Amino acid sequence: MNFFKIFIVIAITASSIAFAHSGVKDKNVKERMMLMKAMADNTKLIGQILKKQTPFELNEVKQALEKLSSLSLQTPTVFEVNATDPKSEAKQNIWDEFDEFTKLSNELAKNTSELANLVENIDDLRPTLMKVSEGCKACHSKYRE
């Protein structure tokens, strides 16, 4: 997957999440959406640094990756309640396959934490962002409308 495709996926995800929040009535769904928005924001920051729209600061990149790891670990918790809302993009199979959903989330947490320890300079960002995007896509392609 090339960088342009990754950036488009991030941009679409961030904009659809922001739009989706308006009018959400179920508190569980809103909590899930807020967590996903935080994940998108951290991923977007890395993309902006890679595109040189934001200056490279190693500590910021590491913090964004650690935050992604933490949010990934929280993801199964916010999906424990099978709550619905017309604005929700969560597919029913999340709860039908909750162990697999949790496994994918935990893998993303592990990978982003490892990446936070490996990234050293701006040249490391492209493969880092690709790895993060692959983890997001693994879950979204299966469990998101």
Q: How would you describe each model-predicted region?
A:
Residues N2-I10:
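Sec-dependent signal peptide recognition
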Residues S15-A20:
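N-terminal signal peptide c-region/cleavage motif recognized by signal peptidases
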Residues S22, D26-E145:
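Sequence context surrounding c-type heme c attachment/ligation sites in exported
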